[in-house]
Amino acid sequence: VLLAAILARGGGGGEGNMDGNFGFPQPWWHTCLLLLGASFFFSNAAHAWDDLADAPIDILIPRTARRPIPRGDVSRLAALTFVLANAAGAGITLLGFPDPAGAFRYALPNILATVYYPYAKRHTNLPQLVLGFCLAWGVVMGAVASGCEPFALGDIIRLHPNNNLPRVFSLHLPQGHHHSLPIPKPTSIPPTLTLNLNTLLPFTSLSFNPPALTLSTPFLTLLTASALWSAIYDTIYAAEDIEADLRLGLGSLPVLCGLQRTKSALWGLLVVLAGCLVLCGMSLPGGGDVGAGWVYYALAPGGCTAALGAMVWSVDLRDARSTWWWFRYGYWLVGGALVGGLGSELIGRVD
């Protein structure tokens, strides 16, 4: 959770001038402490909520039956109290963000997704993608903590207008919002994308004017790559429980694909992940032009593809020891590659 937020700082934690140098509304250590606190409390609340909601199922699966709540060492009331206390702690840390009200609006989609996640396997075979969304949302909150808008939905979800806060994008701001961010040079990979429902559905007559959704391309691609990274890892982890999931009627990517085709699905996710990281680098503003340096491409897309590719190739989905080893240790290879690639961009851009 914290790593996803830290990655956002390297992926565009502010924008200051035509050279692509970055400036932050707060000292970098202050922002990192905020992200550490928010990640700590959110992770506690999310894990406890997942265990609480899953307790009736966990007691039916040998691998999870000895967890604290199913075995009765922690009462459901105590677990719920722990969830609420840590959720309150996460909410309090939002007060330290440059725009607390805006930070809450950006956090709300992930709050709802995290509450739903334990029930996703009851309704769909794609709970790994739901989990990926929840964990990758740290990219959004890392951007917001740095004073950046990773996306804006009209005036409904955006940061409070403030000329002192840098923006990841400002090409399509609605009238009445004035920011001093210069427009980057044209590129084949635009730094922003604007989606308008009336434009996307030209043959549909809407009785209202829906707000336009403006997306920062670097953050959209980094968010997608982070979500797929988590989905790949959790799919390997979920392979341990495929027999119990089939017996209980629960869904997962291994259940959907079967163990024989799960690796093919993982290779497909990895290809999309690598493509997103390449697009992220191509759309980053910098050096008077647009695009990341060669160090980014070598470490982020290259390193992640190599590390995840080795994991998908080597893991034995039928061996719990193999899946657990890769789930536990392979994380550091991918995380290190991402931190190194995006960190190389951040170091060269901070004012």
What are these regions, as identified by a protein language model?
Residues 1-351:
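Multi-pass alpha-helical membrane architecture of UbiA-family
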